[in-house]
Amino acid sequence: MEPSIKGDQEMLKIKKQGHQDLELGLTLLSRGTATSSELNLIDSFKTSSSSTSHHQHQQEQLADPRVFSCNYCQRKFYSSQALGGHQNAHKRERTLAKRGQYYKMTLSSLPSSAFAFGHGSVSRFASMASLPLHGSVNNRSTLGIQAHSTIHKPSFLGRQTTSLSHVFKQSIHQKPTIGKMLPEKFHLEVAGNNNSNMVAAKLERIGHFKSNQEDHNQFKKIDLTLKL
């Protein structure tokens, strides 16, 4: 009987000790002075809950990805960087289109002669068109074309010089304005006019020489002897 009584007493002591330890742990936990093992257990529950929430958030993102749409063509992109590059390309295209329209309007407002020669060429040839082709007797013209002397032509060369001057004046009146001519054509026609002037001058010199020679021959034929 005694050993059994002693065993029962020891069991009661163990139970009491266990109850006391449990009460002590609860009091320490309520005061915030729990042991490290208890704290680690609590933290493990917290980390597991946070990991599950993060995993759920990732699954939601994969299930419903964010989409960015273009403001110009309504094209959809899955990143803001790709959308920004696409919209910058749209802006460059619109800038080039506006610049092309501006140049087109500017060119259409210019006169037709400006397309062939440019602004400087038009003003230069327009000023040249206002200059006289023939200067006065005493002064040279601005274009460098000298006027011929106004000496009297011989009678037998009158028709030739008159016809040449008529042809020369007709060619001048038939030419278009210098402002609408090409520079190469203008120089060629000025050279042709100079050649015709040189021919007329040569004919004048030949006629003057022939008239002097005929006068000299007639002077020789005169009989200067006195007849009584």
UniProtKB/Swiss-Prot annotation:
Superkingdom as given in the UniProt entry: Eukaryota
Compartments annotated for it: namely:
Nucleus
GO CC entries: nucleus
Q: What is its main location?
A: nucleus
Q: Which UniProt keywords apply?
A: Abscisic acid signaling pathway, Metal-binding, Nucleus, Zinc, Zinc-finger
Expressed, tissue-wise, as follows:
Highly expressed in the shoot apex, including the apical meristem, developing leaves and developing vascular system.
Matching SUPFAM superfamilies, A to Z? beta-beta-alpha zinc fingers (SSF57667)
Q: Does the keyword Ion transport apply?
A: no
Protein name, per record: Zinc finger protein 1
What induces or represses expression of this protein, per its UniProt record? Answer: Induced by white light in dark-grown seedlings.
The record ties this protein, via PANTHER family, to:
C2H2 AND C2HC ZINC FINGERS SUPERFAMILY PROTEIN (PTHR47287), ZINC FINGER PROTEIN 3-LIKE (PTHR47287:SF15)
Q: What InterPro entries does UniProt report for this protein, alphabetically?
A: ZFP3-like, Znf_C2H2_sf, Znf_C2H2_type
What gene is this protein a product of?
ZFP1
> Any further remarks?
Seeds over-expressing ZFP1 are insensitive to inhibition of germination by abscisic acid (ABA).
Specify the residue ranges making up the C2H2-type zinc fingers.
68-90
